[in-house]
């Protein structure tokens, strides 16, 4: 602020400095950062976060700082757009002080130099580059900093440099060279005695002169050179004040000041400092010149071409920028919660470009020219090869470590990410960039952040972090001695804690199990490498012995940690966790060694063979052969080989296949002693007859391996007698010959029948076994079955003559006695196709079947297998004699609804069915039947039938009813009922389960909907309409009729709805009768009626309102003699559709009868589809259609209620499965015009889709739903349109959808009757009746004339037919009363076999034609 003012400044405030801060609005004092005599610097808080407030206390209260403040504000405006500058955001004065306010950053360069992790070489270069670039940017704006020092160079958490505390306008440009107090007063605020000022700044003449002097850019260059030198001197200042004066006078040179280490390690750096620290300002290079001169020489090209600009983009992304001529912007942390996620997504999407710019070798996923045996890391759309760093490109990338700049940003900002999916992407990026840094950097800079991610709340993040930790550790080739015990002291304890805390997260435990072996192998390599390095550097023998003892201690601790983790995983209750460990267990066995593997691993693996899950047994068998080779022949013979042979009898055939395959591999390695070949052959040879071809082929190939390792004499003396019965004739023992000459296997039915016989046999000799103490070579007890001799000796049959037909003769001339039950089973085999000569095959398979059955019964049932496989039952529990108990439900209504129909409604025995379940036997029912209704004046007390356990529905009290407004009380008050079950048992679990079932009556049992009608009135044959006017009715209520519906119930009704909410119901019989006039029923709704839909078979219908309501009405009839008259319109249900959008309302309703249910499908104006149960008016399903396809305006449900079709304004037709609410297909055609109407037409027992819209040249198109192809087109003219207009175009393949091509609010009216389409054009004048079967019979009504048209039918393709319209002649009809106004609705009905047509026009008239 000038020398004159500053010399008068108070050296200490008269009151506490905090009092100057607290008087500011929304600012709270925190602490004082320095106690400079010139400017007091404090940290404070405001709504935007932490701020720094610099306070200048005025020497006099009348002192004005206005001119200085104006200069500071102009400077701040210039600097506000630079991302590497932190300008003052608030500059103002009070009567006592001047204030400078800026954002607070925690770290400056001076503090960062003493903080771990220290800068690497590439980071130091990038910081220097940023400093020069920032200085260039401010100098380009003609802004001078004036006081560059390490305290004013701020750094973010990821080392982005920011210049702050510009002081060229508040501190003197020159100070006296004979007054050190001036230097301390202005520039030595930190009291470090370090001097960063340029030598020329010390000029007594200019400092004491009256002229205005400004600081120069060269001064900033010198100051920045001192900061750069300090950066390489590990925080030691280059000059103090006395040294600077000596340097200025020439007593010191730069070579004397710079240490020799800098000159030797980086001679280029010395050149840079010389160009910046010249005593003569004119010899100093500018920031721009320095950047250009040392490009490639010192700074990599990547800094210039990509890295700096990309980092600057990351800094500015999602941040707020002040408006023009503003120096501040108000923003809070809440405003930037998602900004880091946006930056992360950008880096992830730009990964390929980043790697290309940083010259990191990556592969595209489409590139198939890589070795598939290599491991790859997939990030975004790129692949990184793992464990293959031999190429020069990869080595250069690692040595350069340029990827560390992006890596540091990702690591520092990982904790600020909000969404788990973005954290997963960040972990992938961290791992990818870590592949291109040095090993020490991997362990010191990356690993801590990956390990910290193991404590994240998201399971996905934990799993990805565990995989990334393992991959990163595997990529480390040369660890240093500091990281020797990283597994014991750091990594494994955290993995152990993750395993213990993740008991409910099976995916986390799976990730640990799958990576444990790799970690164990790498931990062993770490120790071996570090021991080797240590032994070569320690010559002291005593110290060597001490080191060996420490090494052994850590080795034992490391092994114990891995042992604990392994046991926890091996005993985990989840099968998937065990399987994950088995897939990669060999490295873990190698780490433990033979003894530990036997004790820790093998003892647990043996128990897996008794597990119910076949996948676990199969994976165990696949890995057991490798473990056998690792553990040696003794373990192989004593433990593993017997287990393998035992598992051949597994009940799961895939497990058996896996066993045989691994046994063959073991034989091929000659790891099995020949003394076991006989027992193996004897055990396997019956499986040649097994119906599974895989088992059969693997058995034969296994036998070939045994034969190949034996001499010919051994084969014929030992194996030949065992194998001969299973081959048709003597053959050479080769694989091809054995397979081609083996006996045919038994069929699958025969094999299943044999197993069933074994399981169900009771009185049998065939399956009777003889007790023996003999065991085979594998320790398995042999199975001996009874024979004829044994039966005679032990069953008293020595002297008895036994019939020969109760013996089974085998190929070995062995007679097997049979009981009558056995004889019955043998007859079954013969009936299944097994001949007498083939019965020996079931004898050969008998032992294997018994062993496999015993193996199945030995496996205990686990909780997992009980839940996942309910069909498996424990062997000690039998349901063979337990009969199923079928439970029936019965629904009984408590009382009829307030509105009953006995007296009011007309009953016709031919057309109405009453539900039998609505009858009652108590006294109340008699009163109800006599009087018609029973109204309780006071509510009844809720009752629960506690004495009957099979009646469990609470009886709710009825509401008070008003006799005068009975129709209002009926709304949303369905009849109360109880549900009875036929279960009379005492099992609490079954009772609880039955109570949880949602049992509702069928719709026909709800009396408020009226009686079920069997009205089978046929649809009108509109082709017989002649256009003769019958009569006309004026609309007696306000509004224009917009909606209409014909309802076929006990009678035929015509329902109209207006835009004013007027709902009218007409009796069609009286409406078409010229001799009688009837007054319609009227109901005034609260808003415009948007849609009407009748409930087929009921005197009820649905109405949709623009006020978001859906109302269900019942038409009540009265009886006047034999006549049935309209009496009342009753609202029985209502529902408000308002959800997230208050302006949502229904635009179309479809009915979906589903067995005893009746569901409503409602389409809203927000393209949402709701499925309601009409009985409860509850939402069953909500479907949000694809907004990219445009607003949905039409809908239709097929006749079988299986398919839903939707049409949009952009011409898209969506086909959905109505049962599962899954989209099947979305397509468009033609010009993609709006789909105004969709309908279903039955033709030749096939459902066709009628589409009105999509193409302008046709009235409508017919589509084959099965083939999804256009079948028939009714063209508006006699010109054939292009075939391309009717090709199916997949909606997802469209680049841009056509929205609002047809802006007309007037839509054509389309009605479907049998095979005819009634089409009213969009101007409401011409009415077309188009016959899809006989196009020549189509006609058009227009005023008093009937235009007859013929259609020429063209078979364009094998599947497409076009009907081209041709105008023939006009026929005059006495039709003077034909409406001249625009037609609003068209309906057709049939009365006494005569068709009628009702037209409503915009003037409100209902016109009837025949």
UniProtKB/Swiss-Prot annotation:
A single GO cellular-component term from the record reads: late endosome
The membrane topology of this protein is: Lipid-anchor
Tell me the protein's name. non-specific serine/threonine protein kinase
PROSITE patterns found in the cross-reference section? HEAT_REPEAT, PROTEIN_KINASE_DOM, PROTEIN_KINASE_ST
Write out the GO MF terms.
Answer: ATP binding; protein serine/threonine kinase activity; ubiquitin binding
Q: Which reaction does it catalyse?
A: L-seryl-[protein] + ATP = O-phospho-L-seryl-[protein] + ADP + H(+); L-threonyl-[protein] + ATP = O-phospho-L-threonyl-[protein] + ADP + H(+)
Q: Which organism is it from?
A: Candida glabrata (strain ATCC 2001 / BCRC 20586 / JCM 3761 / NBRC 0622 / NRRL Y-65 / CBS 138)
User: Which keywords does this Swiss-Prot/TrEMBL entry list?
Assistant: ATP-binding, Autophagy, Endosome, Golgi apparatus, Kinase, Lipoprotein, Membrane, Nucleotide-binding, Repeat, Serine/threonine-protein kinase, Transferase, WD repeat
**What function does this protein fulfil?**
Serine/threonine-protein kinase that plays a role in signaling in modulation of host immune response, intracellular survival and virulence. Required for impediment of phagosomal maturation in THP-1 macrophages. Regulatory subunit of the autophagy-specific VPS34 PI3-kinase complex I essential to recruit the ATG8-phosphatidylinositol conjugate and the ATG12-ATG5 conjugate to the pre-autophagosomal structure. Within the PS34 PI3-kinase complex I, VPS15-mediated phosphorylation of VPS34 may be required for recruiting VPS34 to the membrane but not for activation of its PI3K activity.
In terms of InterPro entries, this protein maps to:
ARM-like, ARM-type_fold, HEAT_type_2, Kinase-like_dom_sf, Prot_kinase_dom, Ser/Thr_kinase_AS, Vps15-like, VPS15-like_hel
Fill in the PTM field for this protein: Autophosphorylated.
Ranges for the HEAT repeats: 441-478, 485-525, 556-594, 596-633, 635-672
Source organism phylogeny: Eukaryota, Fungi, Dikarya, Ascomycota, Saccharomycotina
Task: Tell me the protein family, please.
Answer: Belongs to the protein kinase superfamily. Ser/Thr protein kinase family.
Repeat region (WD), residues: 1037-1076, 1187-1226, 1230-1273
Q: What is its EC number?
A: 2.7.11.1
Quaternary state and interactors: Component of the autophagy-specific VPS34 PI3-kinase complex I composed of VPS15, VPS30, VPS34, ATG14 and ATG38; and of the VPS34 PI3-kinase complex II composed of VPS15, VPS30, VPS34 and VPS38.
GO BP terms: namely:
cellular response to potassium ion starvation; late endosome to vacuole transport; pexophagy; phosphatidylinositol phosphate biosynthetic process; positive regulation of transcription elongation by RNA polymerase II; protein localization to vacuole; protein retention in Golgi apparatus; protein targeting to vacuole
Q: Where in the cell is it found?
A: Golgi apparatus, trans-Golgi network membrane; Endosome membrane
Q: What happens when the gene is disrupted?
A: Leads to large vacuoles and defective respiratory growth. Blocks maturation of the phagosomes and renders cells hyperadherent to epithelial cells and susceptible to the antimicrobial arsenal of primary murine and cultured human macrophages, as well as to thermal, salt, oxidative, genotoxic, cell wall and cell membrane stresses. Displays defects in protein trafficking.
* Limits of the Protein kinase domain: 27-299
């Amino acid at each position: 602020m000038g020398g004159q003012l500053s010399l008068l400044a108070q050296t200490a405030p008269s009151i506490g400095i905090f009092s100057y801060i607290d008087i500011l609005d929304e600012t709270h004092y925190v602490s004082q950062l320095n106690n400079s005599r010139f400017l007091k610097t404090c940290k404070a808080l405001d709504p935007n976060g932490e701020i720094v407030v610099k306070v200048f206390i005025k020497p006099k209260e009348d002192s004005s700082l206005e001119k200085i403040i104006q200069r500071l504000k102009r400077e701040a405006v210039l600097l506000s757009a630079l991302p590497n500058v932190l300008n003052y955001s608030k500059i103002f004065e009070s009567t006592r002080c001047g204030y400078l306010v800026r954002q607070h950053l925690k770290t400056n360069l001076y503090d960062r130099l003493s903080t771990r992790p220290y800068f690497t070489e590439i980071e130091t270069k990038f910081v220097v580059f940023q400093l020069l670039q920032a200085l260039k940017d401010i100098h380009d704006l003609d802004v001078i900093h004036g006081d560059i020092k390490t305290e004013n160079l701020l750094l973010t958490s990821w080392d982005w440099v920011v210049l702050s505390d510009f002081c060229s306008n508040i501190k003197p440009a020159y100070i006296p060279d004979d007054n050190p107090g001036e230097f301390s007063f202005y520039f030595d605020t930190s009291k470090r005695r370090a001097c960063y000022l340029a030598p020329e700044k010390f000029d007594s003449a200019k400092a004491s002169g009256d002229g205005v002097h400004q600081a120069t850019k060269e001064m900033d260059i010198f100051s920045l050179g001192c900061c750069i030198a300090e950066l390489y001197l590990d925080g030691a200042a280059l000059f103090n004040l006395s040294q600077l004066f000596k340097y200025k006078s020439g007593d010191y040179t730069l070579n004397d000041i710079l240490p020799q280490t800098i000159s030797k390690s980086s001679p280029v750096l010395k050149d840079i400092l010389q160009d910046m620290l010249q005593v003569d300002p004119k010899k100093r290079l500018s920031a721009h010149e320095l950047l250009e001169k040392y490009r490639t020489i010192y700074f990599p090209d990547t800094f210039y071409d990509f890295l700096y600009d990309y980092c600057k983009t990351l800094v500015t992304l999602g941040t707020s920028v002040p408006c023009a001529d503003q120096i501040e912007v108000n923003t809070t942390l809440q405003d930037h919660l998602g900004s880091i996620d946006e930056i992360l997504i950008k880096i992830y999407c730009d990964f390929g470009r980043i790697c290309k710019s940083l010259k990191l070798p990556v592969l595209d996923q489409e590139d198939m020219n890589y070795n598939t045996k290599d491991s790859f890391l997939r990030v975004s759309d790129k692949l990184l090869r793992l464990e293959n760093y031999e190429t020069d490109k990869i080595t250069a990338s690692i040595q350069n470590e340029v990827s560390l700049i992006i890596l540091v940003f990702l690591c520092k900002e990982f904790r600020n990410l909000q969404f788990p999916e973005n954290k997963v992407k960040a972990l992938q990026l961290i791992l990818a960039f870590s592949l291109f840094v040095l090993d020490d950097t991997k362990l010191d800079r990356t690993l801590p952040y990956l390990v910290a991610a193991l404590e994240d709340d998201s399971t996905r993040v934990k799993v990805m972090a565990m995989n990334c930790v393992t991959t990163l550790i595997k990529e480390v080739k040369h660890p240093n001695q500091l990281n020797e015990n990283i597994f014991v002291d750091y990594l494994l304890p955290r993995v152990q804690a993750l395993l213990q805390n993740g008991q409910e997260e099976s995916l986390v435990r799976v990730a640990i199990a799958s990576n444990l072996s790799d970690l164990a192998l790498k931990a062993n390599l770490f120790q071996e490498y570090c021991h080797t390095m240590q032994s070569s550097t320690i010559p002291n023998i005593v110290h060597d012995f001490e080191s060996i003892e420490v090494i052994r201690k850590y080795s034992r601790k490391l092994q114990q940690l891995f042992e604990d983790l392994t046991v926890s995983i091996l005993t985990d209750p989840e099968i998937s966790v065990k399987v994950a460990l088995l897939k990669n267990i060999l490295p873990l066995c190698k780490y433990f060694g033979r003894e530990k593997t036997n004790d820790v691993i093998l003892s647990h693996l043996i128990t897996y063979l008794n597990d119910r899950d076949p996948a676990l047994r199969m994976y165990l068998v696949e890995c057991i052969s490798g473990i056998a080779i690792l553990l040696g022949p003794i373990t192989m013979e004593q433990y593993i080989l017997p287990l393998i042979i035992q598992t051949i009898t597994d009940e799961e055939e895939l497990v058996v296949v896996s066993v045989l395959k691994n046994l063959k591999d073991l034989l091929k390695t000659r790891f099995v002693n020949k003394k076991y070949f006989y027992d193996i052959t004897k055990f396997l040879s019956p499986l040649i007859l097994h119906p599974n071809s895989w088992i059969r082929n693997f058995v034969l190939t296994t036998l070939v391996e045994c034969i190949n390792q034996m001499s010919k004499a051994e084969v014929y003396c030992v194996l030949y007698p065992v194998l001969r019965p299973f081959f048709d004739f003597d053959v050479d023992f080769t694989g091809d010959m054995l397979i081609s000459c083996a006996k045919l296997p038994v069929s699958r039915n025969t094999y299943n029948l044999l197993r069933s016989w074994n399981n169900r046999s009771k009185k049998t000799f065939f399956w009777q076994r003889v007790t023996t103490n003999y065991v085979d070579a594998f320790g398995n007890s042999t199975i001996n079955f009874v024979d004829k001799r044994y039966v005679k000796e032990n069953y008293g049959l020595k002297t008895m003559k036994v019939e020969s037909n109760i013996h089974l003769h085998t190929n070995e001339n062995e007679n097997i006695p049979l009981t009558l039950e056995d004889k019955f089973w043998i007859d079954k085999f013969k009936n299944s196709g097994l001949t007498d000569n083939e019965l020996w095959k079931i004898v050969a398979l008998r032992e294997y079947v018994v062993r496999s059955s015993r193996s199945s019964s030995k496996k205990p049932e686990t909780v997992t297998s009980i839940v996942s496989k309910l069909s498996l039952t424990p062997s000690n529990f039998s349901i063979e004699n337990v009969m199923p108990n079928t439970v029936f439900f019965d629904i009984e209504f408590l009382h009829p609804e307030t509105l009953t129909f006995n007296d009011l409604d007309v009953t016709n025995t031919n057309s109405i069915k009453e539900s039998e379940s609505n009858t009652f036997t108590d006294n109340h029912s008699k009163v109800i039947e006599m009087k018609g209704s029973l109204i309780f004046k006071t509510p009844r007390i809720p009752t629960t039938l506690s004495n009957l356990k099979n009646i469990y529905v609470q009886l709710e009290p009825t509401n008070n009813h008003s006799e005068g407004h009975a129709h209002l009380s009926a709304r949303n008050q369905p009849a109360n009922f109880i549900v009875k079950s036929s279960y009379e048992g005492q099992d609490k679990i079954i009772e609880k389960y039955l109570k949880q079932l949602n049992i509702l009556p069928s719709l026909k049992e709800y009396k408020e909907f009226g009686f079920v009608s069997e009205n089978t009135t046929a649809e009108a044959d509109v082709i017989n309409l002649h256009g003769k006017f019958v009569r006309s009715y004026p609309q007696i209520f306000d509004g224009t009729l917009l909606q209409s519906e014909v309802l076929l119930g006990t009678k035929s009704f015509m329902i109209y709805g207006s835009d004013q909410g007027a709902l009218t119901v007409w009796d069609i019989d009286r409406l078409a009768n010229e001799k009688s006039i009837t007054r319609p029923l009227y109901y005034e709704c609260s808003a415009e009626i948007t849609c009407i839909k009748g409930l087929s078979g009921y005197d009820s219908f649905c109405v949709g309102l623009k006020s978001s309501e859906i109302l269900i009405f019942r038409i009540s009839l009265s009886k006047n003699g034999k006549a049935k008259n309209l009496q009342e319109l009753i609202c029985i249900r209502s529902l408000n559709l308002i959800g997230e959008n208050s302006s949502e309302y229904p635009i179309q309703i479809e009915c979906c009868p589903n067995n005893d249910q009746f569901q409503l499908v409602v389409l809203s104006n927000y393209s949402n589809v709701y499925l309601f149960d009409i009985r409860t008016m509850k939402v069953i399903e909500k479907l949000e259609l694809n907004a990219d396809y445009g607003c949905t305006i039409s809908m239709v449900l097929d006749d079988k209620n299986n398919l839903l079709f939707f049409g949009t304004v952009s011409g898209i037709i969506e086909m959905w499965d109505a049962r599962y609410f899954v989209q099947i297909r979305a397509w468009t055609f033609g010009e993609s015009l709006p789909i105004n109407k969709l309908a279903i037409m039955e033709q030749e027992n096939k459902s066709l889709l009628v589409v009105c819209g999509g193409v302008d040249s046709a009235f409508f198109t017919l589509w084959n739903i099965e083939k999804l192809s256009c079948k028939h087109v009714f063209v508006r003219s006699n010109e054939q349109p292009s075939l391309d207009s009717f090709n199916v175009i997949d909606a997802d393949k469209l680049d841009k959808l056509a929205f609002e091509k047809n802006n007309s609010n007037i839509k054509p009216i389309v009605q479907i009757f049998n095979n005819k389409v009634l089409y009213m054009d969009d101007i409401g004048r011409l009415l077309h009746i188009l016959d899809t079967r006989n196009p020549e019979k189509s006609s058009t009504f227009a005023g008093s004339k009937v235009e007859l048209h013929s259609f020429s039918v063209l078979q364009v393709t094998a599947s497409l037919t076009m009907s081209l319209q041709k105008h023939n002649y006009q026929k005059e009809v006495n039709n003077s009363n034909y409406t001249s106004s625009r037609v609003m609705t068209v309906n057709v009905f049939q009365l006494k076999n005569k068709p009628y047509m009702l037209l409503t026009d915009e003037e409100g008239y209902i016109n009837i034609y025949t």
